[in-house]
């Protein structure tokens, strides 16, 4: 995950009142963007997610490019299409790369289950 062009920022712990698997599902689900992150990462008037593929390989589970129209994907206040690539490395460890006109953003999530209904997230 090392890239000299990235600025590394460690975040967490974040305590979730949800199972670790539910928290991971939310991290991987781009279809919620228009409803939960409306105005920034999604727009209810355009909830369409174009088809993409999911493959299993030696790295884990990976998606092809997921193209999404976002109202303000990088804080510059301009609507544009962005591209996400997701990887699931282990059952509770995943990452995505988001490519915008302003550059590239990478996020890594590792979840620690505390109980059936609580977990801790690290980014």
State what each model feature region is.
Residues 1-123:
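C-terminal catalytic domain of Rieske-type non-heme iron oxygenases
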């Amino acid at each position: 995950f090392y890239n000299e062009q990235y600025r590394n920022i460690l975040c967490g712990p974040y305590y979730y009142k949800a199972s670790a698997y539910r928290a991971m599902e939310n991290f991987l689900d781009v279809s919620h963007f228009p409803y939960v992150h409306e105005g920034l990462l999604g727009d209810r008037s355009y909830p369409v997610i174009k088809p993409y593929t999911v493959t299993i390989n030696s790295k884990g589970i990976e998606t092809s490019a997921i193209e999404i129209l976002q109202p303000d994907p990088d804080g510059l206040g301009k609507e544009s299409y962005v591209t996400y690539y997701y990887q699931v490395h282990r059952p509770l460890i995943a990452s995505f790369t988001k490519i915008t006109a302003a550059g590239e953003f990478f996020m890594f999530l590792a979840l620690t289950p505390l109980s059936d209904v609580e977990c801790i997230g690290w980014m």
